[in-house]
Regions:
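N-terminal hydrophobic/helix-forming segments and targeting peptides
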Residues: 1-456
Length: 456
């Protein structure tokens, strides 16, 4: 089903399945606006399907369902296959971090009767898109006594929202002469928290009132910002988009749409696979996949090591064989073709909404710099599988040559000598506070990922 519009094949029964699946996805997306929430919600979904931590198993056998969590920001789950791990795994890997605005460690200040939060944006954003929209605050505050306070402000209907102001058009003559990259600077992305002074305070009374509210509601003080991790994200739930309800608008489709569909493909398995099936959800992709929770961390290989150790006698050669024989889909989104900005695409090699799961044989920029370039033999295997399963799919590049580019986690796992190719959902308005995906593509990704887990 190559380059066909998926909507055309759905009968009424299948259309209901498409819409129902997307309702569950919308719930996950709305509830998973940070990496920590994405992981905790993944754990809930997995446990509801019978997955358990490794400690719950004395010795794993085919069909067992096991999961790992790393530092509350990575999630890995496995369905043990009938073949030994050294024969390789079938892995779906996505990232659960999204572009956002982070709160600095010493952030709270008052200026001219406004209480403001100083911030530092995370990932590649068009900064001007983040002003004058309702924003929410999510994260954790870790106190010296070891307690951890969960913060969520802005999505409960009874909550206030916060935001970042912009200059009125009437006084914007100088601002309008700036380039889009400079019209809002990084240091301008400070969040307004309040304007009401605390009675009896003479200095920084508005800031004092905000601190009073935080103390009463969350029991933390200004000094606790030093050990806090607070993220500013768009407020509000994901929504149906378009009069025909054919699309989903929401924050964080990149890459939680692939994270959710990959997760569901594994946890919904109701049979013992030939090869162990795996879903791995990683952090820090938007800033280079670095650190203990990024794809470059050793944690993923460590989990395979733990499985080998549980099921047999561990050795380095067993781990290397398992990795080398593994086949993986780097489940990441692709740039959707937008007719309003058609000039950035090669139309023959673009990702179209509604045409199904999108493969990127290679990513990178300019002369394929930083690319993972998948083996054509591997792509041929996948083509044959998806055609036999009736899954709609397409291939694309990330725009015209020299127009720009981007990368994924694919090359990192490719460095382990796995077979890896990027496969995900086409997204409009990528990295904006509101991104758009087709419900058909979400469903076809789920079906494609399920089929991949059976690849011989």
């Amino acid at each position: 089903m190559y380059r066909k519009n998926a909507w055309e094949k759905y009968d009424e029964e299948t259309l209901e399945l498409v819409m129902s699946f997307n309702e569950s996805y919308k719930q996950y997306l709305s509830a998973s606006k940070t990496e920590r929430l994405a992981v905790s919600n993944a754990v809930k979904l997995a446990e509801a399907k019978g997955f358990k931590p490794l400690e719950a198993y004395e010795k794993l056998v085919p069909g067992d369902k096991v999961y790992f969590v790393n530092k509350k920001k990575n999630f890995v789950c496995y369905v043990i296959g009938s073949e030994p791990l050294e024969a390789g795994l079938r892995v779906l890997g996505a990232h659960i971090d999204s572009p956002r605005i982070d709160v600095k460690q010493d952030p709270l200040y008052e200026r001219d009767n406004f209480a403001l939060l100083d911030t530092h944006y995370y990932g590649g954003i068009k900064k001007y898109q983040w002003v004058t929209i309702p924003l929410a605050i999510y994260g954790v505050v870790c106190k010296k006594d070891g307690s951890v306070i969960d913060v969520a402000i802005g999505d409960d209907p009874t909550d206030p929202v916060v935001g970042i102001s912009d200059l009125l058009i009437h006084l914007s003559a100088d601002q309008m002469q700036k380039s889009a990259a400079k019209v809002i600077e990084g240091e301008d992305l400070d969040v307004t928290l309040g304007s009401m002074p605390l009675k009896g305070e003479e200095k920084n009374a508005v800031k004092a009132n905000v601190l009073r509210i935080l103390k009463e509601k969350y029991d933390f003080e200004e000094a606790d910002f030093v050990s806090a991790e607070l993220e500013i994200v768009p407020a509000g739930p994901s929504r149906d988009y378009g009069l025909d309800r054919s699309m989903v608008a929401g924050y964080g489709h990149d890459d939680r749409v692939c994270a959710y569909t990959s997760l569901r493909a594994v946890i919904d398995m109701d049979f013992v696979p030939t090869y162990t099936a795996c879903c791995v959800l990683v952090d820090k992709e938007e800033v280079g996949s670095i650190g203990a929770t990024g794809a470059q961390s050793k944690f993923f290989a460590d989990t395979i090591m733990y499985l080998i150790d549980n099921m047999s006698t561990y050795s380095e050669i067993k781990l290397r064989k398992a990795l080398t024989n593994t086949k993986m889909l780097s489940s990441d989104v692709s740039a959707g073709y937008d007719p309003l900005f058609a000039y950035v695409n090669d139309s023959k090699n673009a990702a179209y909404l509604g045409h199904g799961l999108c493969f990127n044989k290679y990513t990178g920029s300019r002369g394929k710099s930083g690319a993972n370039d998948a083996m054509p033999e591997y792509m041929a295997e996948i083509r044959n599988l998806l055609d036999s399963c009736g899954v709609n799919y397409q291939t694309a590049e990330l725009g015209k040559v020299d127009q720009g580019g981007g990368g994924t986690i694919a090359y990192i796992l490719g460095n382990e000598n796995m077979y890896v190719i990027d496969a995900g959902v086409a997204v409009l308005c990528m990295h904006a506070p509101m991104e758009i995906v087709s419900k058909a593509d979400v469903y076809e990704a789920y079906q494609g990922y399920k089929a991949f887990l059976t690849l011989e």
